Each structure stands twice: as C-alpha cells, then as structure tokens.
Amino acid sequence: MPSVSEAKREYEERFNGCLTKYGRVLFCLMDNVRSQQVHDVRRDLRGLGELVMGKKTLQKKIVERRAEDKKASAYDKLLYNTCIEKKLLCGNTALIFTNEEIPVITAVLDKHRVQAPARVGAIAPCDVIVPAGNTGMEPKATSFFQALNIATKIAKGTVEIVSDKKVLSVGDRVDNSTATLLQKLDISPFYYQVEVQSVWDRGMLFLREDLSITDDVVEKYLLEGISNVAALSLGAGIPTAATLPHMIMDAFKTLLGASVATEYEFDEFDGKNLRKAALEGNLGGGVADAAAAADTGAAAAPAAAAEPEEEDDDDDFGMGALF
C-alpha cells in the first residue's frame, strides 16, 4: 500500500496532467449524489473527460504551486486567482476536465439523474406541490393533511385533496410532517445528480445561469438586434446595408406612383411597361398599392378644388335665398 506522501504525489501528477491536457474544467456540486452514480458517470465519461474528486486543501495547493512555478503560464495564474476569488474549490464539489462541448458533458450527467424521496432534514432542490385528487387514504389520516394546511374532503370513504398545495419551496428544509405525508402519498419529489455550478473555459469563467445560453439563443438575439437596428434606420431614413434595398424599393414605388398619376413615362427599369401594368391592375404587391394611392390622390385634387365654386353659387343668391 503506497504511503500518504506517495499517494499525494500521484494525485498531484494526475491533477496537473488534467490541467495540461484539458482546456475546460467543470466545477460540479455533489450533494446527495450516491457512489453508484459517480461510478456510472465516470464510466460514461471515458473518452470525453475525467471526473476528479479529492480534498479541496490539496487541490488548492496544487493549483497554487502550479501558478507560482517559474514556467507558469498566464492561464495558470489566472486560474489560481479565479479559484481563490470565486471560491471554486470549496464545499462538496468535484471537477470534470474535458475538451468537449459543455452540452456533451451535461447530457452524460443528466442521464444519471436519480429520483429520491424527501428525507427529514434534506434541503429542497425544487418546489414540491401535492396535486389535487383522491389519495386512497382512510379518513383517520386527515391529521397529516391538517398539519400542513392542506384542504381535504371525504369522498367515497377516502380522503380527497381539494386543490393543489405547495408544501416545499426551493431551499426549505424538510420537516417530519412533510416527509411523512409525502411518503404516505408515495411521492418522491427530489432529483439528485452531478450538477454543474460553473465552467472554466480557457481563461473565462461561466456561471450556472450562463450555461443555458446556447448557439441558437445567441443567434436569435443577434437577429432580433439586427432587425431592431434596421427598423430604426429605416424609420429615421438612414441608409445602411440592411435598409438600403428597402429604401430604394420605396423610392421606386413612389416614382412609379407619380408616373401613373401624372401620365409621365420613364424608360429606365422598364418604366413604361410597369406603368401600363399598374393602370390595368396587373401589378401586384406594394408597387400597385403605391400607384393606386397616387392615382387616387391625383383624382381627388380637382374635386377638392371644385368645392369653392359651389360656395360661390350660393353667394350669388344673397338675401334672395330667404324668399
């Protein structure tokens, strides 16, 4: 059996080897994770990465010595400073070293997610809701529900829950009454797994909430931003690569509309045929609408100008209109 110092030396060599070989480090929470889960995760990570556990004090010393070495890179120094500042090497955590994309690793971890009952003293990792419906329990069991303020009624000789009731929120500690009731209802509400808390990716630290941002989400936000900028530029009349085609098309529609309204023909861009098609109603899309609007506006102008003449006729009668 190797001595303690020899075991530490071998562990340090393995840890340093992982830091050299892999560019990504996943810091994972191991609370309530069973040894069999760890074994299964390690098995499925073969060829993808390595899961390393151990004492945090030893891991800190290894990272510190690596950063203080004369041959230490800026990457090694930054990793050490980040581990100390963000307290990454604390608590019940494990490290997964990999060069694979993060979703590949999280898919392996999610595969070994285990359902578990709510035990007394456990911290709820999620909200727990007892659903409405018949429980199949005898009326004498109503005391369990009353202790948790769950509305019930007796239906066909059994206890029936009137409406859904939240009995635990995230972070709550499971008490004896809640654990007993959930056990009687055969509800195992908790799920435990190796859970990624943060990722060190070649000099950058990503927190848990950042991991939900995928390439598809980034593309969606980027397209929305481009669309908003294009709409703003178009409304302000500022030519950009995105708005210039629309501005040219709008100007051409206006020109064609003016051609239809004033009987002016232009040879460029097949203007004569387009004008003829607009007059015959064979021109589709916004161009026809613009031409029709211009034609309607031109026809309405003489009618508007004729209105004062009717008022002049009334004025000719003078007082005679009273008789």
UniProtKB/Swiss-Prot annotation:
Protein keywords: Phosphoprotein, Ribonucleoprotein, Ribosomal protein
Post-translational modification: Phosphorylated.
Gene3D superfamilies, per the entry: 3.30.70.1730, 3.90.105.20
Region Disordered, residue ranges: 298-323
SUPFAM superfamilies noted in UniProt: Ribosomal protein L10-like (SSF160369)
MF GO annotations: large ribosomal subunit rRNA binding; structural constituent of ribosome
Acidic residues composition-biased segments: 307-317
InterPro entries recorded: Ribosomal_protein_uL10 (IPR050323), Ribosomal_uL10 (IPR001790), Ribosomal_uL10-like_insert (IPR040637), Ribosomal_uL10-like_insert_sf (IPR043164), Ribosomal_uL10-like_sf (IPR043141), uL10_eukaryotes (IPR030670)
Any one annotated GO CC term: cytosolic large ribosomal subunit
Annotated GO biological process: cytoplasmic translation; ribosomal large subunit assembly
Family stated for the protein in its record: Belongs to the universal ribosomal protein uL10 family.
Function: Ribosomal protein P0 is the functional equivalent of E.coli protein L10.
Subunit structure: P0 forms a pentameric complex by interaction with dimers of P1 and P2.
Protein name per UniProt: Large ribosomal subunit protein uL10
Organism: Trypanosoma cruzi
